[in-house]
């Protein structure tokens, strides 16, 4: 098991223990080379807690000891006093940091901060030193649902990560920004009862490669088609897209109309001249400000977000939610963990920077309207009927719906309503 996966399991256990004690905390995992593997601050944890958790994790990783045990060793004249004196403030002798070991060797340090020292120590030690064995319903056991496996395949010049499970006709699920295949995690068990499900990480997302280019939706759709062709599943697919995944799904269906039996396009406009009509500010508050912000090519988005990935993902998701906390801390950590890699952080913005190329491609695609049945979905608290109104021009057989009492994240905010709608349409 790789260190990032282990770190996510530890963070899940910290979340469970902090919830049990009703103490919101920050948790950081740092490897023995001083690199941040994962960092997350729960809602309600003090602003300073993230920095202190990092110091505790750094200290435990490099010293190989509990920070609570360091107090007598860092007093003036003691063995480790010079360590604190020259550390520039990065070391900490406050309880709440513990080393993470594998086969008796220290592989990382874990730091927790947000409560009293005693609470921080209790939470981190319950999570790392004496964790409850993960059961079939425990938070550490179910990142990939039962009946599914996570795999990789080389497709042309990229490696595509994907989750596969279930049995039946092929159902392909394409996620949006800043998500990964994990967007569909809660729905996968139900989908798997009727379909062979393929949920990939798009080029530049999750555990898929993040190359320098290829983020136009025509190329990203070709990645998915190549994957399905390798798997022998390209014929007669049902295809569902959300957000950026909607743009990729459309490009896929337009390029291979005879291979797609049903198409779902949800909560995203398709790149065409209509994009310029979306305001960044509305009478109800912020509009599509992110389209312009992400499209900056001078590195501004990357520079602002680097080092704040967890906060960025949590707050960005929150701005588009009607049902707050529909996407929880574990999901935020999952998405943010991949953005710590500069190539993946940049790739997410390249999806938006490619819109001019997408517009040119779609101007050709729209000359032949989609022949398959298309379900176009908007959310009442987000795009509403803008989605079906636009898709009507692209398809010959379109059904449009608006999910009530819902924000942009329709698959997490109204999962049961969405499941029923998709069951009716996809069958």
In which residue ranges do the predicted regions lie?
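Hydrophobic residues on the short alpha-helix immediately C-terminal to a glycine-rich phosphate/catalytic loop
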Residues: 127, 187, 252, 421-425
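Flexible "cap/lid" subdomain of the alpha/beta-hydrolase fold that forms the substrate-access gate
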Residues: 138-152, 157-160, 170, 198, ...
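Catalytic histidine-centered segment of alpha/beta-hydrolase-like enzymes
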Residues: 406-415, 419
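Flexible, solvent-exposed loop/hinge segments and secondary-structure transition points
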Residues: 1-136
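Short glycine-rich catalytic loops that host catalytic nucleophiles or stabilize transition states
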Residues: 86, 401-406
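Cofactor-binding loop segments of dinucleotide-utilizing enzymes, especially the Rossmann-like FAD-
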Residues: 32, 379, 405
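Conserved HGGG/HGGXW glycine-rich cap/lid loop of the alpha/beta-hydrolase fold
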Residues: 158, 163-207
């Amino acid at each position: 098991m790789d260190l990032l996966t282990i770190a996510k399991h530890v963070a899940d256990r910290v979340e469970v223990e902090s919830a049990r004690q009703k103490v919101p905390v920050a948790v950081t995992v740092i490897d023995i080379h001083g690199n941040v593997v994962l960092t997350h601050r729960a809602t309600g944890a003090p602003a300073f807690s993230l920095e202190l958790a990092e110091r505790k994790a750094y200290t435990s990783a490099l010293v190989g000891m509990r920070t609570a045990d360091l107090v007598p060793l860092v007093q003036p004249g003691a063995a480790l006093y010079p360590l604190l004196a020259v550390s520039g403030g990065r070391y900490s002798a406050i309880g709440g940091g513990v080393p993470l070991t594998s086969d008796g060797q220290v592989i990382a340090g874990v730091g927790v901060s947000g409560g009293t020292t005693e609470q921080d120590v209790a939470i981190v030690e319950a999570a790392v030193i004496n964790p409850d064995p993960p059961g079939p319903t425990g938070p550490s056991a179910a990142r990939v649902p039962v009946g599914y496996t996570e795999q990789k395949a080389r497709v042309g010049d990229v490696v595509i990560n994907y989750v596969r499970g279930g049995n039946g006709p092929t159902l392909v699920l394409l996620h949006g920004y800043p998500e990964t295949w994990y967007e569909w995690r809660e729905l996968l068990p139900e989908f798997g009862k009727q379909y062979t499900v393929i949920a990939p990480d798009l080029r530049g997302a999750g555990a898929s490669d993040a190359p320098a280019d290829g983020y136009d939706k025509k190329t990203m759709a070709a990645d998915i088609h190549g994957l399905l062709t390798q798997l022998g599943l390209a014929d007669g697919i049902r295809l569902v897209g959300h957000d950026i995944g909607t743009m990729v799904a459309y490009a896929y269906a337009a390029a291979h109309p005879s291979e797609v039996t049903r198409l779902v396009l949800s909560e995203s406009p398709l790149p065409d001249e209509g994009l310029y009509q979306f305001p960044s500010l509305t009478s109800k508050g912020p509009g599509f400000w992110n389209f312009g912000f992400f499209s900056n090519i001078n590195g501004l988005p990357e520079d602002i977000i680097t080092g704040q990935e967890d906060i960025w993902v949590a707050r960005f998701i929150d701005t588009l939610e009607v049902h707050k906390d529909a996407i929880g801390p574990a999901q935020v950590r999952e998405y943010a963990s991949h953005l710590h890699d500069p190539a993946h952080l940049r790739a997410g913005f390249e999806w938006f920077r490619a819109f001019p190329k997408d517009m040119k491609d779609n101007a050709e695609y729209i000359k032949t309207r989609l022949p398959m049945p298309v379900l176009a979905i908007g959310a009442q608290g987000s795009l509403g009927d803008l989605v079906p109104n636009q898709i009507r021009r692209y398809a010959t057989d379109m059904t449009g719906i608006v999910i009530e009492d819902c924000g942009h994240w329709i698959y997490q905010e109204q999962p049961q309503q969405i499941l029923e709608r998709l069951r009716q349409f996809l069958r």
